[in-house]
Design a protein with these regions (language model features):
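Specific transmembrane alpha-helical segments of multi-pass solute transporters/efflux pumps
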Residues: 13, 56-101, 149, 237-255
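Hydrophobic transmembrane alpha-helices of multi-pass small-molecule transport proteins
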Residues: 46, 113, 131-154, 289-309
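Hydrophobic alpha-helical transmembrane segments in multi-pass integral membrane proteins
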Residues: 14-16, 80-86, 145-158, 205-220, ...
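C-terminal-most transmembrane helix of multi-pass membrane proteins
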Residues: 119-122, 258-320
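Specific alpha-helical transmembrane segments that line the substrate/conduction pathway
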Residues: 33, 40, 86-131, 258-280
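Hydrophobic/aromatic residues within transmembrane alpha-helices
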Residues: 24, 34, 87-89, 114-116, ...
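Transmembrane alpha-helices of multi-pass small-molecule transport proteins
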Residues: 27-80, 107-114, 142, 175-179, ...
Length: 320
């Protein structure tokens, strides 16, 4: 329950990404700066946190020992996650991006067989491959249907080319984020805390963000002061607060695939928060009745997940 509540809070701060990225795109800001500045701004904050804890050398040593794994999975979890999101913001609305992003509800569970763990069976260490948590997948399906329903009224008004430019990059991001996050949890194997892991991932991907920023300057010129401020807001609320909260929540339940799926599913509430945010900040209209049905399904799915530890799935599925 604790991990789920933290996940919900993370979803609230993550929603800032979709709303503010939409605002930046409306103001003519380039995705080069929206993506790179977020992580460039994140690094000093994270470094300060790790420095205060006196863990800087330990993190750097861990990176040195696992350089290849750190770079590959940090790039997958951060670069292949955020570049597509900011790119899509130039072609789609924040609510549609946040809705499409909820494919992570399903992708995280589909990726489960890619991960293994070592367990002791009859006194011997045995490598066991994770299985897809089908029960959690069923609950997530309820939420996913709700997300689809939310998008139907608005998506029907969008041209196909804009839909594809907004959808395909997010599809990549939706698989990259949980894959990178879970792989990095395996790499650190509990040796680093959440903030230390996020700091390390941001640090090793810094060269990529710098290159993206330079390319943006060469193609678009320097970013406007408003985009810099907005990117800073995203870095603080989504990059620092939301990322740390979410990674902390997933770390709590990392050894339980169903609970891990439940935490990842809390991110579906980003859609609700994004809709509210765009109504307040961008003046978008209140969703119609069909969309509200979708919101209700998302909330129902979250309620089921919230009490997952108190429900005997064996009794529920016994006769199915």
């Amino acid at each position: 329950m604790k991990a789920i509540l933290i996940g919900v809070l993370a979803a609230l701060f993550f929603a800032v990404t979709f709303v503010v990225n939409h605002m930046m795109a409306n103001d003519g800001g380039s995705w080069y700066f929206s993506s790179s500045l977020r992580f460039i701004f994140m690094l000093p904050f994270l470094y300060l946190f790790v420095l205060i804890k006196g863990r800087t050398k330990f993190v750097l040593k861990h990176i040195q020992q696992e350089k290849k794994a750190w770079f590959i999975w940090s790039a997958v979890g951060f670069v292949l996650f955020y570049v597509p999101i900011t790119f899509s913001a130039e072609y789609s609305l924040g609510w549609l991006i946040s809705g499409t992003w909820q494919i992570t509800i399903i992708s995280g569970m589909i990726l489960a067989p890619l991960f293994v763990e070592t367990v002791v069976i009859n006194g011997k260490e045995t490598i066991v491959r994770h299985k897809i948590p089908w029960r959690s997948l069923l609950i997530s399906s309820i939420m996913f249907i709700g997300i689809i329903i939310i998008q139907i009224p608005q998506a029907s008004q969008i041209k196909l080319n804009l839909f594809l430019l907004g959808f395909l990059p997010i599809l990549m991001a939706a698989f990259s984020y949980p894959l990178g996050n879970r792989k990095m949890m395996q790499v650190v194997n509990g040796e680093l805390g959440t903030i230390e892991r996020v700091f390390g991932m941001t640090l090793v991907t810094l060269p990529i963000w710098v290159v993206i920023f330079i390319v943006g300057v060469l193609k678009e010129g320097l970013p406007s002061s408003s985009q810099v401020v907005q990117a800073f807001i995203v870095a603080l609320f989504s990059g620092i607060i939301a990322t740390i909260l979410f990674f902390y929540a997933t770390n709590i339940v990392k050894d339980n695939q169903e609970q891990l799926a439940a935490v990842e599913a809390t991110q579906s509430l980003e859609v609700v928060f994004a809709i509210i945010g765009e109504m307040i900040l961008l003046g978008l209209p209140l969703p119609n009745g069909l969309s509200m049905i979708g919101v209700a399904l998302i909330i129902i799915g979250m309620c089921i997940y919230s009490f997952i530890d108190h429900i005997s799935f064996g009794k529920i599925f016994k006769k199915s």
